[in-house]
Each structure stands twice: as structure tokens, then as C-alpha cells.
Design a protein with these regions (language model features):
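Nucleotide-activated chemistry modules centered on ATP-dependent adenylation/adenylyltransferase
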Residues: 1-241
């Protein structure tokens, strides 16, 4: 197994998984890959500093390394044949479903490019596109919106986080990131630290193309103080429109 230390998401999400296991009466399999710290490391510079290469809106490899790859590896080990995977996109997120469906191959399956061996001299990896999942979207099929989901879970013993994904997700708007820096200070500080290191060690690379996270953290907003209820999924970078 792997020692669990924590995540860069709202800690409520971890409790949600425990609550769901009790509610449905079934085990939920936890999968894990590299830590975020390891995913962004790119060796050492001449001065001994660790080079940090950050994902950003133009290259979001964090999703592949920390979500898709661990799921694929678990599937490969335990199932290893194409299966239907039910994706939780809601009725207003048809655009996201279309993006996924546009990637289907001629067999209407998604493929994952994975290492399947080594070259004859053992110096290079051999890669193959492996068919592994057929996505299904039951919430879209049944025309389920967020209010339907909230009503369903109302008064049930499962608590959900207000916002999903990493607190410093680069898809989020500036106001939302500022709110996260105040609500989850220690987690957001990790993003600030990594960006400062990346600026020094990897071609001035940053998380967000609009504003450095250190500036977002120190930004003194004038006027309204935001609460969780003031933000939508569009602010989180996942608008279904």
C-alpha cells in the first residue's frame, strides 16, 4: 500500500468518500500515483536546486498523472478489458461529454497510451494505445441538474465539499483563487512556493497566465468579501455552457 499523507483538495472530500462507503455499503477502491511534488520535479540544476515544471492551462499533465494514470493502472491490473465507465457530468455539462466523446476511436472506445515493453536494446520504451473504457453519462441521459442532486442528498449522512479539485487549480478565476488562498491558506501556500521555485528553475514558468499566485495571495480586494455561495462552477473552470 501507499502511506496517505494528504491532498491539495478540500479535506471534506476525503470524508465524503468515507461517508459514501458507509451509505452504499460497499468498498470504494482508492488509487494513487505519484505525489504532486514528484509529478512536477524535473531533476537538478547545476547549482543543486530542484527544477520545478508546473502544469498550466496549456499543458495540464497533472490530470493525466494523478487521475487518469492511476485509474488506468488499477483497471489494467484488475480488469484489463474495455468497460463502461459512468462519468458524473450533469445535464448542463453536455459540452464536457462531447469533448470526451470526440476522442472515441472507431470502436467507440477511449484509448490510453501506455508503456508495453522496451526496445531490443532496452534503451527506449515501447508504447501502445490501449482500448480501455466506453464513457457513459447517466446524469445527462436522465436530465439531472445540480439542484436535483442537492435535493437528493438533503438530510442524508453524506457531506460534500462546496468546491472540488485542488484549491489552487489553475482553471479557476482570480477571485476564486483569492478566496481559496484565504479559506485554505496552508494548501494555497504550497502552490505559491512551487511557483516561486519554478520561476527560478524552469524558464520562468507559472501556474496561471494571468497573475502569479504570490500576488493573488497578497492581493487586497476592495469592496465585497466573497463567500463560497458567491462562486459558480464557471469560476472553478468547469462551466457546462
Amino acid at each position: 500500500g501507499t502511506e496517505f499523507i494528504g491532498t491539495l483538495e478540500d479535506d471534506v472530500i476525503i470524508k465524503t468518500i468515507f461517508d459514501l462507503e458507509q451509505f452504499i455499503g460497499q468498498e470504494i477502491h482508492w488509487v494513487t500515483g505519484k505525489t504532486f511534488d514528484d509529478v512536477i520535479k524535473r531533476g537538478k540544476r547545476a547549482n543543486g536546486d530542484t527544477a520545478i515544471y508546473l502544469p498550466n492551462p496549456t499543458m495540464r499533465f497533472c490530470t493525466t498523472e494523478m487521475k487518469l494514470k492511476p485509474i488506468f493502472k488499477w483497471w489494467q491490473k484488475t480488469i484489463n478489458k474495455p468497460v463502461e465507465m459512468r462519468i458524473g457530468f450533469r445535464a448542463n455539462e453536455m459540452r464536457r461529454a462531447k469533448t470526451m466523446n470526440d476522442k472515441l476511436n472507431s470502436n467507440n472506445l477511449l484509448e490510453y497510451k501506455s508503456i508495453v515493453g522496451k526496445s531490443k536494446n532496452g534503451k527506449r520504451n515501447k508504447w501502445k494505445n490501449i482500448e480501455w473504457q466506453k464513457p457513459a453519462f447517466p446524469l445527462i441521459t436522465d436530465v439531472i441538474y445540480k439542484d436535483n442532486i442537492i435535493n437528493y442528498w438533503n438530510n442524508k449522512p453524506v457531506k460534500f465539499a462546496v468546491h472540488n479539485n485542488c484549491v489552487g487549480c489553475f482553471h479557476r478565476e482570480i477571485h476564486m483563487l483569492k478566496h481559496m488562498s484565504e479559506k485554505h491558506t496552508s494548501k494555497f501556500d504550497w502552490f505559491v512556493k512551487q511557483e516561486e521555485q519554478s520561476r527560478k528553475t524552469y524558464n520562468d514558468r507559472s501556474w496561471n497566465l494571468k497573475m502569479d499566485y504570490s500576488k493573488i495571495k497578497s492581493w487586497n480586494r476592495q469592496g465585497q468579501i466573497f463567500t463560497d455561495d458567491d462562486f459558480t462552477e464557471c469560476d472553478s473552470g468547469y462551466c457546462g455552457l
